[in-house]
């Protein structure tokens, strides 16, 4: 089958209506769940982004290395080219591979040495991905540009890009010194989101330049959708593996105007609606190409939820009785269960029974071995050493 991983960002166990939320409705995710298996005891591998995604792609626990913590925006690539990834495995099986959206695994060889005005290597192409269009860092970290096949998308030669995580650039405004320029979102105190200003929002890290390449936060979801749909259309005649990492519901939460105010829960609730919309558009693209029945979709989150994560977006004030963590304790950054226990849905209409709920204990780290068994690939020596196949489940 074709295989798509949809990995949300900071989406909690209780954030969607198919997992018990009642203040926010997620009809597209609910439809996906009803078309397959909804797992109730599934876990990300860590309660933060970088180690979670590292383990998802490699099948190795992140704690086996000491450089897999939350990556800076100018981090060198955390997964090394000599490591075997799940994308390498799919390529060996004859699949076309792609990675779109949130990455947070670094680019280039060493931290702080990238020239963002050229192709940055090593990158996803060295990890088995034929195509990539990724956020260079995270939504709240500079550089705020898209990297398509490891080069800045819509690069503006009149505004060369410079990035620093050690000192500001002279003459460049910052959230700390120029709060009057924060026209879209203001940071919460003591979270560090008071440095470079892009799109009226201050970030972590310092940046100058970018020009026409700089993203607008309200368009990030639409860019992910457009690039995902394009990949599906280009590869509709051959098997593909596609990783889609959404920016929703990570900070800064600044959804498209079509969603603003629709949830009644502020920007965080609106971002959940935007995530559901994204899922719907991916399903729609598969249907249009006649691929839905033979496409296995795994939907999950990189870690548990966080409400106040550094911006004044009324997420706390408007939360009401919504419980992003469900009936669990903890959340993102936490060792308690809600830090890693996340939504996990598997849908493959051709093969997987519809409308099933499973309380089996599963982990994202086991997707590597599971997919290898699915496509008939033996695990290479040293590959996915912590991954066990869950195909029997």
Name the predicted role of every residue range.
Residues 1-391:
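Formylglycine-dependent sulfatase
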């Amino acid at each position: 089958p074709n295989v798509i991983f949809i990995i949300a960002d900071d989406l909690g166990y209780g954030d969607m209506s198919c997992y018990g939320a009642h203040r926010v409705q997620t009809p597209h995710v609910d439809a996906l769940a009803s078309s397959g298996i909804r797992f109730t005891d599934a876990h990300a591998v860590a309660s933060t982004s970088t180690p979670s995604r590292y383990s998802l792609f490699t099948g190795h626990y992140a704690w086996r290395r000491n450089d897999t913590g939350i990556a800076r925006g100018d981090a060198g690539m955390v997964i090394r080219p000599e490591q075997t990834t799940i994308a390498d495995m799919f390529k060996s099986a004859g699949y076309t591979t792609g990675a779109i959206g949130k990455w947070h695994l670094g680019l280039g060889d060493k931290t702080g040495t990238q020239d963002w005005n050229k192709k940055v290597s090593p990158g996803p192409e060295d990890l088995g991905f034929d195509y990539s269009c990724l956020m260079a860092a995270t939504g709240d970290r500079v550089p705020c540009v898209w990297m398509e096949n490891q080069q800045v998308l819509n690069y503006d030669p009149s505004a060369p890009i410079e990035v620093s995580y050690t000192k500001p650039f002279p003459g460049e405004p910052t959230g700390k010194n120029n709060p009057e320029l924060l026209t879209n979102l203001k940071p919460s105190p003591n979270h560090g989101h008071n440095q470079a200003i892009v799109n009226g929002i201050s970030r972590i890290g310092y940046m100058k330049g970018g020009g026409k390449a700089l993203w607008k936060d309200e368009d990030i979801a639409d860019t992910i959708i457009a690039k995902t749909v394009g990949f599906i259309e280009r590869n509709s005649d051959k098997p593909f593996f596609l990783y889609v990492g959404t920016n929703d519901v990570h900070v800064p939460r600044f959804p498209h105007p079509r969603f603003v105010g629709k949830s009644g829960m502020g920007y965080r609730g609106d971002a959940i609606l935007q995530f559901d919309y994204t899922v719907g558009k991916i399903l729609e693209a598969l249907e249009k190409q006649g691929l839905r029945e033979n496409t296995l979709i795994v939907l999950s989150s990189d870690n548990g939820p966080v409400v106040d994560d550094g911006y004044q977006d009324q997420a706390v004030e408007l939360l009401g009785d919504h419980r992003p963590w469900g009936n669990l304790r903890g959340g993102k950054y936490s060792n308690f269960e809600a830090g890693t226990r996340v939504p996990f849905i598997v849908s493959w209409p051709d093969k997987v029974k519809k409308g099933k709920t499973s309380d089996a204990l599963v982990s994202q780290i086991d997707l590597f071995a599971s997919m290898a068994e699915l496509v008939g690939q033996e695990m290479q020596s040293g590959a996915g050493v912590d991954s066990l196949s869950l195909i029997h489940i």
